[in-house]
């Protein structure tokens, strides 16, 4: 018995790709625009409901195509309103996505890979190793699935998602070919229509890919720094051995020079590890290292996970660290932890690739006092 033909998942196309596909099947490109409105603005995945497409086209699409996002395996709500979604992929793997509501926004923390290859020692995701990259449909499908589950609205003030942070499982710059089209859809007015300042990509420092990113799309940038010197960063963020701090920061400055989304500043993420990177001397060193890179700094209280060798810095140590940075005129925010009672806080996202006791999620990243980030 012959295998069932694989259907084309329309979530894998950004607007340019969808127009090209419609042209290839003999349809006018404007049909792609209509399709995008149905999928992303109306949340419709059933071609029969797309009533402004003629019946012949609907039948053709049903035979050849599908609109398929990852399914919800389970979801958990936290006491602060945060919801963690475990989404099941083709092949049975799972990734976790976190929705963080706040008074004036709702942020979604999105994964780019199953697992992560970067081996950051303080991150639970890194302990599971790397499995595979997510496809465009699996990345934008996280946004679509959560948005349609929470409830789409034509009222911009009631949007289920106002901000997206690429801070979930994985290193986004190691999956650039799928992350960029997915972010295109986040920004596209026919899809989710988010401002480029409300879509943030976080990287641990894949410098060549960062240069490529700047040539392909303009979104807000956050960097996972976590150490003020190469010796320590080599230990806790091993990609630093390939792209040391000064090389990384030079790449950041090149990106900022091309970008309007960042308003001239990068967000520097720094997880506070007790007795490791949180001394006042290290704060002085960090301020000096960042002197030539316009930035705002998010200090992230470490979120422990089972088997972690680290502990969280005390509030008093974090406050002292922040005051030293502020004395240099740097903008400093101590990130507010969200969703930690459901393992949905920064550094706790793992998914289903490994033992569930290692599960990890990430936190919130915002331009003010709240942030979501899943450490790489």
From Swiss-Prot:
Where does the protein principally reside?
Answer: cytoplasm
Q: Does the keyword Transmembrane helix apply?
A: no
Q: Which cofactor does it need?
A: [4Fe-4S] cluster
Q: Which GO terms describe its biological process?
A: rRNA base methylation; tRNA methylation
Record's catalysed reaction(s):
adenosine(2503) in 23S rRNA + 2 reduced [2Fe-2S]-[ferredoxin] + 2 S-adenosyl-L-methionine = 2-methyladenosine(2503) in 23S rRNA + 5'-deoxyadenosine + L-methionine + 2 oxidized [2Fe-2S]-[ferredoxin] + S-adenosyl-L-homocysteine; adenosine(37) in tRNA + 2 reduced [2Fe-2S]-[ferredoxin] + 2 S-adenosyl-L-methionine = 2-methyladenosine(37) in tRNA + 5'-deoxyadenosine + L-methionine + 2 oxidized [2Fe-2S]-[ferredoxin] + S-adenosyl-L-homocysteine
Q: Where in the cell is it found?
A: Cytoplasm
Q: Where does [4Fe-4S] cluster bind?
A: 116, 120, 123
In alphabetical order, the GO MF annotations are: 4 iron, 4 sulfur cluster binding; metal ion binding; rRNA (adenine(2503)-C2-)-methyltransferase activity; rRNA binding; tRNA (adenine(37)-C2)-methyltransferase activity; tRNA binding
- What are its GO cellular component terms? cytoplasm
Q: Specify which residues bind S-adenosyl-L-methionine according to the UniProt entry for this protein.
A: 170-171, 202, 224-226, 303
Keyword annotations: 4Fe-4S, Cytoplasm, Disulfide bond, Iron, Iron-sulfur, Metal-binding, Methyltransferase, rRNA processing, S-adenosyl-L-methionine, Transferase, tRNA processing
What InterPro entries does this protein's entry cite? Aldolase_TIM, Methyltransferase_A, RlmN_N, RNA_MTrfase_RlmN, rRNA_lsu_MTrfase_RlmN/Cfr, rSAM
Instruction: Describe how the cofactor binds.
Output: Binds 1 [4Fe-4S] cluster. The cluster is coordinated with 3 cysteines and an exchangeable S-adenosyl-L-methionine.
Active site as annotated: 96, 346
Give the residue range of the signal peptide: none
Please name the Pfam families in this protein's record. Radical_SAM, RlmN_N
Q: What is its EC number?
A: 2.1.1.192
UniProt keyword Methyltransferase, yes or no: yes
Q: Which family does it belong to?
A: Belongs to the radical SAM superfamily. RlmN family.
Q: What PANTHER family is this protein classified in?
A: 23S RRNA METHYLTRANSFERASE, RADICAL SAM CORE DOMAIN-CONTAINING PROTEIN
Query: Any miscellaneous information on file?
Result: Reaction proceeds by a ping-pong mechanism involving intermediate methylation of a conserved cysteine residue.
Which function does this protein serve?
Specifically methylates position 2 of adenine 2503 in 23S rRNA and position 2 of adenine 37 in tRNAs. m2A2503 modification seems to play a crucial role in the proofreading step occurring at the peptidyl transferase center and thus would serve to optimize ribosomal fidelity.
Name the record gives this protein: Dual-specificity RNA methyltransferase RlmN
Q: Which organism is it from?
A: Pseudoalteromonas atlantica (strain T6c / ATCC BAA-1087)
Instruction: Quote the gene name from the UniProt entry.
Output: rlmN
């Amino acid at each position: 018995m012959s295998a069932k033909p694989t259907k084309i998942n329309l979530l894998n196309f950004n607007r340019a790709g969808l127009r090209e596909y419609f042209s290839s099947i003999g349809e006018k490109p404007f049909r792609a625009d209509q399709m995008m409105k149905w999928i992303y603005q109306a949340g419709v995945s059933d071609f029969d409901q797309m009533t402004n497409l003629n019946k012949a086209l609907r039948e053709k699409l049903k035979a050849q195509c599908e609109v398929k996002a990852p399914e919800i395996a389970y979801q958990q709500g936290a006491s602060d309103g945060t919801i963690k979604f475990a989404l099941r992929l083709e092949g049975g793997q799972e990734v976790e996505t976190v929705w963080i509501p706040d008074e004036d926004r709702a942020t979604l923390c999105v994964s780019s890979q199953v697992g992560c290859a970067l081996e950051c020692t303080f991150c639970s995701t890194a302990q599971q190793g790397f499995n595979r990259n997510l496809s465009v449909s699996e990345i934008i499908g996280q946004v679509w699935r959560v948005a349609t589950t929470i409830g789409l609205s034509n009222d911009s003030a009631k949007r289920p998602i106002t901000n997206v942070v690429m801070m979930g499982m994985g290193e986004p710059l190691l999956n650039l070919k799928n992350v960029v089209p997915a972010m295109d859809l986040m920004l596209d007015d026919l899809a989710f229509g988010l401002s480029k300042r409300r879509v943030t990509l976080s990287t641990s420092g894949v410098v060549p890919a960062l240069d490529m990113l700047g040539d392909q799309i303009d979104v807000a940038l956050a960097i996972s720094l976590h150490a003020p010197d190469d010796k320590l960063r080599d230990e806790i963020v091993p990609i630093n051995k390939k792209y040391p701090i000064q090389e990384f920061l030079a790449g950041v400055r090149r990106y900022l020079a091309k970008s309007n989304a960042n308003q001239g500043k990068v967000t520097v993420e720094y997880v506070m590890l007790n007795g490791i990177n949180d001394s006042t001397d290290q704060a002085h060193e960090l301020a000096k290292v960042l002197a030539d890179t316009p930035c705002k700094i998010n200090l992230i209280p470490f979120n422990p996970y089972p088997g972690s060798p680290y502990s969280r810095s005390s509030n008093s140590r974090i406050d002292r660290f922040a005051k030293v940075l502020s004395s240099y005129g740097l903008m400093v925010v101590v990130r507010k932890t969200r969703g930690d009672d459901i393992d949905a806080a920064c550094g706790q996202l793992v998914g289903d690739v490994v033992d569930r006791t290692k599960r990890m999620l990430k936190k919130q990243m915002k331009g003010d006092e709240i942030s979501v980030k899943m450490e790489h």
